[in-house]
Amino acid sequence: MKSNSVLIPMVVEQHSRGERSYDIYSRLLKERIIFITGTIEDNMASSIVAQMLFLEAESLDKDIFLYINSPGGIITSGMSIYDTMQFIKPDVNTICIGQACSMAAFLLSSGTKGKRSCLPNARIMIHQPLGGYQGQASDIAIHAEEINKMKKKLNKLMSLNTGQSIKKINKDTERDCFLSAHESIKYGLIDLILTQR
């Protein structure tokens, strides 16, 4: 049987009173770096929100760096991250490493303007919300209406993030729309491509 667990590297720091070891993500959190990796769902979103609130409590003036490599995920989970990004005082730098698709692309575009970036070979994909529901016809209709409301809300916010018209966002998100790093700058999803520190 294969295990899905990933070995998390440990970092050992030497101090005058001995050693202290951290998992790599805890150590990076000390540098105000947070990772969104994998599918965005409630447990992951709660962890991201908690980390942002912790970093805000540590310093209101220092930027937070949100590294994203995600295929997207649940809309409500992503919106809890988005709302927290807007709520906290520190600027949130968003950096795509690998991919930012669907909700992850929305979060990438929602970073502080001028501080949204990706690496040269990253890919970004935007599309309309997906939903799957089964049950009575009346329940399916309720869920379809909710998905349409979410689509309108997300497209309006994406328009504000990118500077694109809602009409263009509606058209481009009708199907999966993949963008390279350079195309993402032109579209307004990001502000710069990082090639080196």
UniProtKB/Swiss-Prot annotation:
What is one GO biological process annotated to this record? protein quality control for misfolded or incompletely synthesized proteins
- Give any Gene Ontology cellular component: endopeptidase Clp complex
> SUPFAM superfamilies of this UniProt entry?
ClpP/crotonase
Catalyses which reaction(s): Hydrolysis of proteins to small peptides in the presence of ATP and magnesium. alpha-casein is the usual test substrate. In the absence of ATP, only oligopeptides shorter than five residues are hydrolyzed (such as succinyl-Leu-Tyr-|-NHMec, and Leu-Tyr-Leu-|-Tyr-Trp, in which cleavage of the -Tyr-|-Leu- and -Tyr-|-Trp bonds also occurs)
Active site: residue positions? S102, H127
- Keywords noted in UniProt: Cytoplasm, Hydrolase, Protease, Serine protease
For this UniProt entry, the molecular function terms from Gene Ontology, in alphabetical order, are: ATP-dependent peptidase activity; ATPase binding; serine-type endopeptidase activity
EC numbers on record: 3.4.21.92
Any idea where this protein resides?
Cytoplasm
Q: Which Pfam families match?
A: CLP_protease
Could you describe the subunit structure of this protein?
Fourteen ClpP subunits assemble into 2 heptameric rings which stack back to back to give a disk-like structure with a central cavity, resembling the structure of eukaryotic proteasomes.
Q: Which family does it belong to?
A: Belongs to the peptidase S14 family.
State what this protein does: Cleaves peptides in various proteins in a process that requires ATP hydrolysis. Has a chymotrypsin-like activity. Plays a major role in the degradation of misfolded proteins.
UniProt-recorded name of the protein: ATP-dependent Clp protease proteolytic subunit
In its UniProt entry, the species of origin is given as: Buchnera aphidicola subsp. Schizaphis graminum (strain Sg)
Protein's gene: clpP
